[in-house]
């Protein structure tokens, strides 16, 4: 587990189990198995029409239906934008109450650090730098970062939706 911003940590499944019983943590589970499946109560696949298809919150924990794959598709950008927006509102709620935040996935190498990167960049951690610069800065503090293609390109595609960059001109 590594602190990447004041009281915001990224890590793996074992890091979650280490803090699970502590009351001053809010947790974002960035993995379908086992957390989203357990929170919603299913095995295998869930119909996309299910009300908790994208995510489910139980008190100070939220589980995302997020799988790590190499295949990227722009077809899921709107789905992911909405999911990340809801997840970041959840994290903001607890961060502003003084909770420590753990953003984790199974191995702590791909999904959690990438979503953690987007979240802390949105807070201004890297002075609203562009995506590639922010990735390099994250790698300096979290060298085990090895994103898979899908989550990497998804967050890169959504970067401007979440990270304001007052230095960069936006041509519309």
Predicted regions and their residues:
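A phosphate-binding catalytic loop at a beta-strand-loop-alpha-helix junction
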Residues: 99-117
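Cysteine-based protein phosphatase catalytic domain of the PTP/DSP
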Residues: 2-100, 121-155
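Alpha-helix boundary/capping detector
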Residues: 113, 117-120, 160-165
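Charged phosphate-binding loop/patch that engages nucleotide di/tri-phosphates or the phosphate backbone
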Residues: 144-172
